[in-house]
């Protein structure tokens, strides 16, 4: 993949991830003045995850680092716009949730329940369930770490 194709794919990924970020921000009653920043932060988070995955990181570590980036930027923007960081960050990380692997794990569980136990279905269930759980854990931990670092009152040593 050449650099032009990569940049076009990155721009498409960022544009398409801004849409659900704005949608969920509207569901969460984010103020209208903050909607564009939620879209931008969702695009930055998903785009940075794509860049890291293209560089060779696996999806769990890429999601963890992208959610830490979203958390840091959200805290900075909350200071500038006098809003809570969750106004920007929660809707921005939702496009990174693992819908496909969670859905595949659920379908595998239904197939095991309906057709009976089979080893390939169980392997598919466990691998997708663990992948989805790891990504959700990476999102939640990565989103909370910047707040722990940046709002610390006591000295570190």
Swiss-Prot record:
Alphabetical UniProt keywords: Cell inner membrane, Cell membrane, Membrane, Transmembrane, Transmembrane helix, Transport
Keyword Cell inner membrane in record: yes
Coiled-coil features, chain-numbered ranges: none
Pfam families: ThrE_2 (PF12821)
GO cellular component: plasma membrane
The organism's place on the tree of life at top rank: Bacteria
Topology in membrane: Multi-pass membrane protein
Compartments (UniProt record): Cell inner membrane
Family annotation (InterPro entries): ThrE_2, ThrE_Dicarb/AminoAcid_Exp, YjjB
GO biological process: succinate transport
Transmembrane domains' residue ranges: 8-28, 55-75, 87-107, 129-149
Function noted in UniProt: Involved in succinate export with YjjP. Both proteins are required for export.
Subunit structure: The transporter is composed of YjjB and YjjP.
PANTHER family in UniProt: SUCCINATE TRANSPORTER SUBUNIT YJJB-RELATED, UPF0442 PROTEIN YJJB-RELATED
Family indicated by similarity: Belongs to the ThrE exporter (TC 2.A.79) family.
Entry protein name: Probable succinate transporter subunit YjjB
Organism (species): Enterobacter sp. (strain 638)
